[in-house]
Curated annotation (Swiss-Prot):
Transmembrane segments: 280-299
Cofactor stoichiometry and binding remark: Binds 1 heme group covalently.
GO MF term set: electron transfer activity; heme binding; iron ion binding
Keyword check for Cell cycle: no
Subcellular location: Plastid, Chloroplast thylakoid membrane
Main location: plastid
InterPro entries from the UniProt entry: Cyt-f_TM (IPR024058), Cyt_f (IPR002325), Cyt_f_lg_dom (IPR024094), Cyt_f_lg_dom_sf (IPR036826), Rudment_hybrid_motif (IPR011054)
Matches recorded under SUPFAM superfamilies: Cytochrome f subunit of the cytochrome b6f complex, transmembrane anchor, Cytochrome f, large domain, Rudiment single hybrid motif
Residues annotated as signal peptide: 1-30
Family, per entry: Belongs to the cytochrome f family.
Protein name, as recorded: Cytochrome f
Record: residues binding heme: Y31, C51, C54, H55
Origin organism lineage: Eukaryota, Sar, Stramenopiles, Ochrophyta, Bacillariophyta
Pfam families to which the protein is assigned, alphabetical: Apocytochr_F_C, Apocytochr_F_N
Length: 314
């Protein structure tokens, strides 16, 4: 257990370090790796992925994977995270920034991230600057990536190696489910439960806005006086566009700013078959027998036609 926690902490630190050194990380971030800190298993019993707890908007993704694979073979699982690259969102510092993307793939037990020497050169070129890692030592079949620049990585490619049932008795030749998730942009909730600045902030009480001031950091301080003369102040983070002005009357929970969220999270699932090579050989043998039978029938038919023609001539 202690080793697992140490691995998580080390992996988290390494990912953040890579982010700081600029391997395709930009100002506005989406961190799938944060899920490691709060969830031992990122997939809940109802099928919901942990990423959806922070990224509240739903956005579509696509998953591409082979229908069937052979044991001990390397293949690709591609998660497509499409979005309008011309759009920007509010960064943590309140400034406009491009969106980043992140992704997660939950493979069947026994399937793992392919080793560097197993990954084709073409995939290495596509994944240059991309750090893909297992979720934990316990769940090495779960792979995560991000944040990476969305403009250049709307397709997340996960190189995977399949297990060999001949070497692992826990693995069988079966059809397995495969789950994937992808997000673009920052989340609306931090892992601590606090709201980020990618939110619509509502009025804490009904009343009239008596004053709006702006701090040096760009934050808006809105003062609301209710009918009893009670004043409340609330701060709207920097970078958000207000929808109210001084003198306006507001209701409880009425939005005070335009919703800045342009991102979102989506998840999909598919199936993959771990195919027994003997079944393929058997199928090919069956096809050969059928083909041979058809050829022999045609030859026999030709011979019969010749015999009939000879008898008629006689």
């Amino acid at each position: 257990m202690a080793t697992n926690k140490f691995f998580k902490s080390l992996l988290f630190t390494l990912t953040i370090a890579i982010s700081l050194f600029g391997l395709s990380i930009e100002n506005s971030s989406a961190y799938p790796v944060f899920a490691q800190q709060g969830y031992s298993n990122p997939r809940a019993a109802n099928g919901k992925l942990a990423c959806a707890n922070c990224h509240l908007n739903q956005k579509a993704i696509e998953i591409e994977a082979p229908q069937a694979v052979l044991p001990n073979s390397v293949f690709e699982v591609t998660v497509k995270v499409p979005y309008d690259t011309t759009r920007q969102q509010v960064g943590a510092n309140g400034k406009k920034a491009d969106l980043n993307v992140g992704g997660i793939v939950i493979l069947p037990k026994g399937f793992k991230l392919a080793a560097k020497n197993q990954i084709p050169a073409e995939v290495k070129a596509k994944n240059k600057g991309v750090f893909i890692s297992p979720y934990s030592t316990e769940f090495d079949n779960i792979l995560i990536v991000g944040p990476i620049a969305g403009k250049t990585h709307q397709e997340l490619i996960f190189p995977v190696v399949s297990p060999d049932p001949e070497k692992d008795s826990d693995v069988k030749y079966l059809t397995y489910p495969l789950y994937a998730g992808g997000n673009r942009g920052r989340g609306q909730v931090y892992p601590t439960g606090e709201k980020s600045n990618i939110n619509s902030f509502g009025a804490v009480q009904a009343g009239q806005i008596s004053e709006i001031t702006t701090s040096e950091k760009g934050e808006s301080n809105i003062t609301i006086i209710n009918s009893d003369g009670v004043k409340t102040s609330q701060i709207i983070p920097a970078g958000l566009t207000l929808t109210v002005k001084q003198g306006d009357s507001v209701k409880v929970d009425q939005s005070l700013n335009i919703d800045p969220n342009v991102g979102g999270f989506g998840q999909e699932e598919t199936e993959i078959v771990l195919q027994n090579p003997l079944r393929i050989i058997g199928y090919l043998g069956f096809c050969f027998c059928v083909l041979l039978t058809q050829v022999l029938l045609i030859i026999k038919k030709k011979q019969f036609e010749k015999v009939q023609a000879a008898e008629l001539n006689f």
